[in-house]
A protein has these predicted regions:
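Short, Lys/Arg-enriched N-terminal segments with co-localized hydrophobic residues
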Residues: 11-29
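Aromatic-flanked redox-active Cys/Sec active sites in thiol-based oxidoreductases
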Residues: 38-39, 104, 120
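Flanking helices and flexible, charged tails adjoining ferredoxin-like Fe-S electron-transfer domains
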Residues: 4, 23, 64-94, 99-100, ...
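Ordered, amphipathic secondary-structure segments that act as subunit-interaction surfaces
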Residues: 92-106, 110, 115
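N-terminal cysteine/histidine-rich coordination modules
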Residues: 31-40, 53-69
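A positional/architectural concept
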Residues: 49-50, 54-55, 72-76
Length: 192
């Protein structure tokens, strides 16, 4: 796979698709789900970021950023440069360094989806999670406590699509099962 740099971080791209992985445990079997970003379809419209803010009832204030961010990305191939957009949120890393970095144990893996979720009740606002995150994802609200994408794990538990996937008008974001990519995941229809 190609290796690219964006937002100061290293990304592995398989063709032009980018995956944020998580596992959903079902009995003894483990399914691997992903929010798949097709870079060729993303036009940086921001619908995913707005849907995320609406889903989480989050208003971005000065000095803050949304849970999902849109970045420009330069891709160099065969001595030519192309520009793509990258819709980036928490990557829900398998061995999430933010969990290890948090001295207050505010971050954890959801046992059903393996998404990195949080409860800021004990958050001391030390920014250790943000410093540990290789993608720089955790940010901090007006109260000084950590906030980030939780993968809409409550929606996923209910059989719904994550808000960003549902709202994407160009089909750039999809919820996929990496173990059975040809099989459609029976979820609610997206807005496109």
């Amino acid at each position: 796979p190609d290796v690219r740099y964006a937002c100061g971080s290293l990304f592995r791209l398989s063709g032009i698709q980018f995956h944020a992985l998580w596992n959903e445990k079902e009995g003894a079997a483990v399914k691997k789900y992903a929010i798949d970003l097709d870079l060729s379809k993303c036009v940086a419209c921001g619908a995913c970021a707005v849907a995320c803010m609406d889903q989480n009832d989050y208003e971005v204030r000065e000095g803050q950023r949304p849970y999902r961010n849109i970045f420009d990305m330069e891709l160099e191939k065969n001595n030519s440069v192309s520009y793509n957009r990258l819709s980036l949120a928490c990557m829900h890393c398998e061995d999430a360094p933010c969990i290890t970095g948090c001295p207050s144990a505010c971050l954890r893996k959801d046992p059903e989806t393996n998404l990195t979720v949080y409860d800021t009740t004990n958050c001391i606002g030390c920014h250790s999670c943000a410093m540990a995150c290789p993608y720089g994802i955790p940010s901090f609200g007006e109260n000084g406590k950590m906030i980030k994408c939780d993968g809409c794990y409550v929606r996923v538990h209910r059989g719904l699509l994550p808000a960003c996937v549902k709202a994407c008008p160009f089909g750039a974001l999809k919820l996929v099962d990496l173990e059975a990519p040809e099989k459609q995941i029976p979820k609610e229809p997206s807005l496109r």
